Amino acid sequence: FLFATMIVASGKFKTNSACLLAGFFLTQSFVSLHELMLYGDQFRYAVLESSPNWFFIGSLAYALDGPLLYLYVVSLIRPNFSLQMKHRWHLIPVVSYLVFLTFAFYGQDAMIKRNIIENYLFDLEWQFVCMDTLVKSSRLFYLAMSIYLINKYREQLKESRSSIENIDLNWLKILVTGFAVVALIGVVLSVSKVIGLFYPVQVEFLIFLGLTTYYTNIIFVCFLLFLFSN
C-alpha cells in the first residue's frame, strides 16, 4: 500500500502508467493479507469469528495483478496508450474467479463456509485447488507476455538505434522478471496440490513452497521500494 501511494505521489510516471503500477502493488497487499488470513495461526480464527465472508476477497488479487502489470508494460512502450473498452477482456480472469467463489464459497451457508476454512478444505477439495491452479497459471501467462513485450521492444530499439528515452528497461525487467519467479513458484505449489489429490505429496514440501512464495514476494517488494526511493 505504501509503495502504491509513493508511485502515484512521485509524479515520475504518466497518469495511466502510475495508476496501473500502483494498482499492481496494491494487489500485492491483498495477496499478503489473503495468505495471512488462510494460514496465520491466530489471525485466521480472529477473522473467522468476525465473518467467514472476509476470506478469499484478497485472493481476487491473484487474478488482477497479472493484467495490471501487463497493461503497465504496454503503457510504457506505447506512448499513445490509453485504457479503452477493448481492455475489458483482461477482466475475464477476475470475473471468472469471482463467479466461481460465489458458487463454491460465498453462496454456501455459514456452517459450510466455516468448515471449509477450519479444515483447510480449500487445499484439499478438487474444485478449489484446480481453480487456484488456473488463476495462478493465468497470472504467470501475463507476466510471461510482459517479458516478451519488453524483449521485443528492446530489439526494436537496437534495430532503429533509438534512445530508450524515459523508459528504464532495467528497472522494468527486474520488476517483471522478479514477480514472474514468484508467480512460477506459486504455480508449482498449486500444481503440487492438484497432484496431491491423486498421489501423496509431502506436507513439508507444500509448506516450504508456500513460505518461499510468501516471503520472496515480501522481500522483493521491499527491494523494489529501496530501488524506487534511490
Residue ranges of predicted features:
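First transmembrane helix
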Residues: F1-F13, L143-A144
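Membrane-interface helix-boundary motifs at transmembrane edges
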Residues: V8-L21, S75-H87, E155-L169
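The cytoplasmic-loop to transmembrane-helix boundary for the fourth helix
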Residues: I77-F103, W126-V129, I164-A180
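Extracellular-loop-to-transmembrane junctions of the mid-late helices
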Residues: F103-A110, R114-Y148, L206-T213
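Membrane-proximal linker segments that couple transmembrane helices to downstream signaling/catalytic modules
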Residues: F226-N230
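Helix-loop junctions on the outward
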Residues: F30-F55, I112-I116, L189-Q202
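C-terminal TM-helix exit segments that contain a strictly Trp-centered aromatic cap at the helix terminus
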Residues: H34-L38, S96-Q108, M145-S146, V182-K193
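Individual alpha-helical transmembrane segments in multi-pass integral membrane proteins
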Residues: A18-V31, F43-L76, H87-T102, D132-K136
